[in-house]
Amino acid sequence: RKDKDVDREEFLVSGFEQLSWVNIHKELEETFGRPIISEHDAKLLAYAEWKCAEERQTDRHVSLVALGSVGFGIGAGIIINGKIVEGQLGIAGEIGHMGINYNGKHAQNGIQGTYEYCAGTESAVRYMLERLYEFPESPLTEKSSYWEILDAYKNGDPLAVYAIDKMAWMLGYGIASIVYIINPDCVILGADYPDLPEFLEKVQRSVSQFVHPSIMENVSIRCTKLKEDTILLGGYYIALEKLFKNNLLLERIRQALC
């Protein structure tokens, strides 16, 4: 976590017995002999999206929320007025822990009612397993991964369609809360979610069930258009801005990359 009582660039590790309260920056800088900059992966993803967002062509102060899902979790980066929202302890955007099912029970890897449990990419695997034996013709098995489900979804497999559609609905259900809490100009889904019109339509339809039409008209919900490693690209931008202050140079680099 970020310790607000020390230098802003000092990061301490907690929650890992063998690394408890290790100053990661100090250790890495001594090892590599170079300055170290650390940031949360979802925040880097969001910053890269903001830098290259088409919405910025008309408004440089566009606010943006980017959602990423890696395995079980969901993380979000929030950009307002060109700044990453950090929060008191640097955990702003940890929306995966947001409860969306009051009756959710405690599970081995968390609470079943959390957003990431219901809408992270791994949720599609559970939804597939729920009805696996109802679809004997499906190519999916008990060992099928999310990516195999996604391939089957693209081929129109009914079981895969059920699993991905349910994930899409739950994803939209959570985005509706984000829209009301943050009121962003755009919400961008990371590359782990299907970049398919039918999937995005399901997400948008879910959001529209819980968000007033006048608000829906003023928020863009779309999939990422970046093809690069977005997290790495975000880290690149952050490092450049910390090392260089020439905004013109940075803008030319941004135009070349986007």
What are these language model-derived features?
Residues 1-3, 72-73, 193:
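Short glycine-rich anion-binding loops that position phosphate/pyrophosphate groups of nucleotides
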Residues 1-64, 198-210:
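Glycine-rich phosphate-binding loop and adjoining helix at the ATP-binding site
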Residues 6-7, 30-34, 54-59, 102-103, ...:
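ATP-binding/phosphotransfer module of carbohydrate and carboxylate kinases, centering on a glycine-rich
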Residues 40, 86, 223-225:
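Conserved residues in the N-terminal Rossmann fold of short-chain dehydrogenase/reductase
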Residues 41, 71, 235:
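Active-site glycine-centered loops adjacent to acidic/histidine catalytic or metal-binding residues
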Residues 56, 60-119:
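Glycine-rich phosphate-binding loop of actin/hexokinase-like ATP-binding domains
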